[in-house]
A protein has these predicted regions:
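NAD(P)-dependent short-chain dehydrogenase/reductase
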Residues: 86-95, 119-197, 210-212, 219-226
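C-terminal substrate-binding subdomain of Rossmann-fold SDR/epimerase-dehydratase oxidoreductases
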Residues: 164-282
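Conserved Rossmann-fold NAD(P)-dependent oxidoreductase catalytic core, especially the SDR/UDP-sugar
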Residues: 33, 60-108, 133
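Helix N-cap/beta-alpha junction loops of NAD(P)-dependent oxidoreductase domains
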Residues: 38-43, 85-86, 143
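Conserved cofactor-binding/catalytic machinery of classical short-chain dehydrogenase/reductase
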Residues: 17, 30, 58-61, 73, ...
Length: 282
């Protein structure tokens, strides 16, 4: 943390406690509400009650505290998990538009809570004039993120597995590997958040890429970046989520003029190198 300025301050607080939330937002102009009890499919599939309870408390407290403290603007990090299951049952699907969220039928409780909390912030906007911005993230990844312990998402988990594997080894892939996803690198995501917060647009907006990849091909891409030949063993008993998910960024590009710039290969190269280097050092 040698590059921190005199204006950086860190507080480790449990935002399920309203008093802590009031302390966190006191004297703050803008709040970026990213706190959540979450993880990849392996976590959210088996922690439904924890995810719904903890995250609902965090976001209700954050909205109320921001209103009471007179925060100028609030960013809420929603998720592509809000989109209905019935629109994601095939591997080849059109990108999901913001309007597709209704009629609502998310794949899991994490998605239901995200959609509920969107409406919490919107309710505070309607009733109390809270100035809000909402982004629906589509699989954000990059260095410095969780890559082990059970909460990691697919890009980090696959990078870790391939980092540990030797050339010619076999790694476990959840599901049949035919699922499709799009992935957005963290730097692009941050640019999108900044653009949204500087805009006047106060409705939910996708932040992601519109280029989907088959998970089996994604594994091959990471292996190629690592310079290894990796075989796959598919475990059909493990959670695999919806069959296909991709982002429609038409609205985001029109409203913000924002579009992801970093290719999947470039982003995965940076992510893999960080995870691989971290494991070697530790």
């Amino acid at each position: 943390f040698s590059d921190l300025s005199d204006f950086d301050e860190f507080k480790l607080l449990d935002l399920r406690d309203f008093r802590n939330t009031m302390e966190a937002v006191n004297g703050v102009d803008e709040v970026y509400a990213l706190a959540a009890n979450m993880g990849g499919m392996g976590f959210i599939t088996f922690h439904n009650a924890d995810v719904m309870r903890d995250n609902a408390l965090i976001n209700i407290n954050t909205a109320e505290a921001c209103y009471r403290e007179g925060v100028d603007r609030v960013f809420y990090s929603s998720s592509a998990c809000v989109y209905p299951t019935f629109m994601q049952e095939e591997t080849e699907i059109k990108g999901l538009k913001e309007s597709d969220a209704y009629p609502a039928f998310p794949d899991n409780e994490y998605g239901w809570e995200k959609l509920y909390s969107e409406r919490v912030y919107q309710a505070y906007q309607k009733d109390f004039g809270l100035d809000i911005r909402i982004a629906r993230f589509h699989n954000i990844y990059g260095p410095e993120g969780t890559f082990e312990g059970g909460r990691e998402k697919a890009p980090a988990a696959l990078c870790r597995k391939i980092s540990k594997a030797k050339d010619g080894d076999t790694i476990e892939v959840w599901g049949d590997g035919k699922q499709t996803r799009s992935f957005c690198y963290i730097d692009d995501c941050l640019e999108g958040i900044y653009s949204l917060m500087r805009s006047d647009y106060d409705k939910p907006l996708n932040i992601g890429t519109d280029t989907a990849i088959v998970i089996n091909d994604f594994v091959d891409l990471i292996a190629d970046v690592a310079g290894k030949k990796i075989n796959k063993k598919h475990d059909l008993t493990k959670p695999q989520g919806v069959r296909g998910r991709n982002s429609d960024n038409t609205l985001c590009e029109r409203i913000l003029g924002w579009k992801a710039k970093i290719s999947l290969r470039e982003g995965i190269t940076k992510t893999y190198n960080w995870i691989n280097g971290y494991k070697k050092e530790n």
